[in-house]
């Protein structure tokens, strides 16, 4: 059993991309040069470093530090889906719902059951504000090494 689960809310609002270098992608959509990725433009297979993404004093995420998966990195996006409820969940229900839904998608991407894996789950999910103002329903599921070791290459199908 994991000691903690990271859940971060995707912030509403617009990220000032003009002040930060954006990640470059090739024709397949894979990141080839590191840079900023808007939280709403993340894709399955994107790798990124923590930076301040999962800081306790930074509960809202506008962007992440995208990095090619061939370089050492902290996280990899393995699923993105929309929450299928009509009203914003109360209390910790959004975090619980996001985690459980990400856990259901874990094995098919990683190739190993969550409970026996060396990887853990990080979730990014809507805030009440982004839910109401932007009709944000998107949840992003990412994996990271439970021992905080850097990952190299995609974890897809590697049964780590």
Predicted regions and their residues:
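N-terminal Sec-pathway targeting helices
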Residues: 1-8
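Primary mode marks residue(s) on the alpha4-beta5-alpha5 output face of response regulator receiver
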Residues: 3, 17-160
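Hydrophobic h-region of N-terminal signal peptides that target proteins for export
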Residues: 10-18
